[in-house]
C-alpha cells in the first residue's frame, strides 16, 4: 500500500480503492495516483511532482 498525503490542493485516498482528484501530491507513488501533469513521463519507481510543469523536477 503506497502512502499518499495530498491535502494541499486536491484529495488523495490511497487505500483499498485509490481515488485522486486535482492531486498535488509531493510523495504519491505512481501505482496509486498519477500525480504528474499530463504529458510528463511517468517514473517506474514512482511519481514525485514539484509543481504543475513538465520538466526535470517533475519526476525523479
From Swiss-Prot:
Location of the region described as Beta in the Swiss-Prot/TrEMBL record: 1-28
Gene field: mta
Protein name: Metallothionein A
Binding sites annotated in the UniProt record for a divalent metal cation 1: 4, 6, 20, 23
Keywords: Metal-binding, Metal-thiolate cluster, Zinc
Binding-site residues, a divalent metal cation 2: 6, 12, 14, 25
Domain of life from the UniProt record: Eukaryota
Binding site for a divalent metal cation 4: 32-33, 43, 47
Family: Belongs to the metallothionein superfamily. Type 1 family.
Source species of the chain: Gymnodraco acuticeps
Residues annotated as binding a divalent metal cation 3: 14, 18, 23, 28
Matching SUPFAM superfamilies: Metallothionein
Binding site for a divalent metal cation 7: 49, 54, 58-59
Residues bound to a divalent metal cation 6: 36, 40, 43, 59
Protein role: Metallothioneins have a high content of cysteine residues that bind various heavy metals.
Annotated binding of a divalent metal cation 5, by residue: 33, 35-36, 49
Annotated InterPro entries: Metalthion_dom_sf (IPR017854), Metalthion_dom_sf_vert (IPR023587), Metalthion_vert (IPR000006), Metalthion_vert_metal_BS (IPR018064)
Pfam families: Metallothio (PF00131)
UniProt free text on domains: Class I metallothioneins contain 2 metal-binding domains: four divalent ions are chelated within cluster A of the alpha domain and are coordinated via cysteinyl thiolate bridges to 11 cysteine ligands. Cluster B, the corresponding region within the beta domain, can ligate three divalent ions to 9 cysteines.
Molecular functions (GO terms): metal ion binding
Annotated region described as Alpha, given as residue ranges: 29-60
